[in-house]
Amino acid sequence: MFSHNRRKLLQASGAILAAGAMSSPLRAQTAAPRVVVIGGGFAGATVAKYVRLWNPKIQVTLIEPNPNHVSCILSNLVMTGALGMTDITLRYDNLRTKYGVNIVADRAVAIDPVGRKVSTQNGSQIAYDKLVLAPGIDFDAVPGLDSAV
C-alpha cells in the first residue's frame, strides 16, 4: 500500500515539476513581444507604424533623438514655394496617438545583442525581442562628399 501511494506521490510530483518547467516558456510566449526600432526616418517610422497595425499586441518602441522628421522627398516643393517647411515637417506624435508606438526621444548609443537591450545616450536601457536598425544616412559623414559637390 505504501509503495502504491509513494508511486502516486512521485507521479504527481513529476507532473507538477513538468508543469512548472513548461509554464516559464508558455509565460514568455504569452508576454507581449517587444520590437525596438532605431531611427525615425521614413523606414523606421513606417516599420513602427505597420508592426502596430498588423499586430496591436506587439509593443513597439521608436528611438529617435529628433522631435520631428523633415521630408527631404518633398523639399523641391518648398523650393518652388508650393509648400512651406511646416508642411513637410512630420511629428512623431502621430505614431504615438494614432498607432500606440512608444517614442523615446533619445539617441541609441549601444546595442547588446546577447542581453537584447539598447542603451541610450541618457542612460536608459530598452529591452527588445526584435530589433530594427533604420538610422538613415548622415551625408556629412561621407568622406569627400563636400569636395565633390
What are these regions (language model features)?
Residues 2-14, 20-32, 103-149:
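FAD-binding core/adjacent interface of flavoenzyme oxidoreductases
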Residues 18-19, 56:
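A generic secondary-structure boundary signal that marks alpha-helix termini
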Residues 29-102:
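Beta1-alpha1 glycine-rich phosphate/pyrophosphate-binding loop at the start
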